[in-house]
């Protein structure tokens, strides 16, 4: 290959053109979507195959990129329904679901009460340290030991209950 200035310039231009990134631009569709396609979309949307749903949504999205005054009433209704309609996660609950939720909640609370009552019925009695007499004796022991003289039982002017928290054993 000859290395002339003309050939070098031609090769340079080809290399520069190849290095420039080109972006594909998709033009918004100017043709309205046919009425039979959009007719009764509220009832047909859930039964449509996913591919057909995606194609219809893309076509509507392309139409919405243009002037909204050019959209037909059917297209506006379909776009609104697809975007905000009661389908998918926004679907209305089936009839009777509230009663079912209430019934299961009541059953769960009742079952937890039965488990609690059963455990209380077969539990051991409270320990001896949970009597009022034992707790008063604990207070006297701590006073004799001069425990916590700054803020506790043996501090000046203390008038709290100390460790007493249970009813008397004779009660």
Swiss-Prot record:
An example of a Pfam family matching this protein is: COX4
> Which pathway does it operate in?
Energy metabolism; oxidative phosphorylation
Any single GO CC term annotated in Swiss-Prot or TrEMBL for this entry: respiratory chain complex IV
State where it is primarily located: mitochondrion
The transmembrane segments are: 101-123
Nucleotidyltransferase recorded as keyword:
no
Entry's family note? Belongs to the cytochrome c oxidase IV family.
Supply the name of the protein.
Answer: Cytochrome c oxidase subunit 5, mitochondrial
Please report the organism this UniProt entry assigns to the protein. Neurospora crassa (strain ATCC 24698 / 74-OR23-1A / CBS 708.71 / DSM 1257 / FGSC 987)
